[in-house]
Every structure is written in C-alpha cells, then in structure tokens.
UniProtKB/Swiss-Prot annotation:
The gene is rplR. The keyword 4Fe-4S does not apply. This is Large ribosomal subunit protein uL18. This is one of the proteins that bind and probably mediate the attachment of the 5S RNA into the large ribosomal subunit, where it forms part of the central protuberance. GO terms for cellular component: cytosolic large ribosomal subunit. One of its GO terms (biological process) is translation. InterPro entries: Ribosomal_uL18_bac-type (IPR004389), Ribosomal_uL18_bac/euk (IPR005484).
Length: 119
C-alpha cells in the first residue's frame, strides 16, 4: 500500500470518527497526532472550537525526554493528563485521529490513564 493510499485511508477513518466523537468543555476531546518521529496531544472543546491545552514531544519542556518513541509517548500522555487534572478536567473523549490503537497511540492513552484521566 503506497503512502498516498495510507494517508487517504486514515483521512476517511478520521472523518467517520469525527462525525461521532465530539468534545465539550466538561469532557473535551483528547486528539492525538503521530508523525514519524514526534507525537502531539491536544484537549479540544468542539462546541467553542478552542484548544484547551496541548503537549508534544517537540515542546521546550520535553526537550530532555529520552528513550524509545513509545516511552516518550507515554510521558506525553502523563503530561497532558496532569495538565488536564490541574484545570479540573478528569473525563475526556479519546480521538485516535484515524490511527490504529497500537504502539505509540496506545502508549499515550495508557500514560494518560495511569495519570488519572478517565476515558
């Protein structure tokens, strides 16, 4: 399967899931994006169209993270969960953004659950 086909397939899956998954102020959407070397997570309120908070492996505060990409993803999950709990958000809707729930996506979700997010 070529890269174009994989990207188009992921976009179709993303569109189908976004028709169902909606974030609110009380229960925002935890949206995950995975590139070849980095991972990004955002808490999004779809009602107002605003990003409430974000964490990524590219940010300055995470410049010292070392280990495998899965270990870094788990650390990003814990970090976004700690930020959310500090703002009083304990429940989220997980949006895997068309990616398979496997590897780094699963590691991020497990890290967020360990830190106290419920989804």
């Amino acid at each position: 399967m070529s890269q174009v086909d994989k990207t188009a397939r992921r976009q179709k899956i993303k569109a189908r899931s976004r028709a169902v998954v909606r974030g609110t102020q009380e229960r925002p959407r935890l949206c995950v994006f995975r590139s070849l070397s980095q991972i990004y997570a955002q808490l999004i309120d779809d009602e107002s169209g605003k990003t409430l908070m974000a964490a990524s492996s590219m940010s300055k505060e995470n410049a010292g993270l070392t280990g495998t990409k899965s270990e870094v993803s788990a650390a990003i999950g814990k970090q976004i969960a700690e930020k959310a709990l500090a703002q009083g958000i304990s429940r989220v809707v997980f949006d895997r953004n068309g990616f398979r729930y496997h590897g780094r996506i699963k590691a991020l979700a497990d890290g967020a659950r360990e830190a106290g997010l419920i989804f």
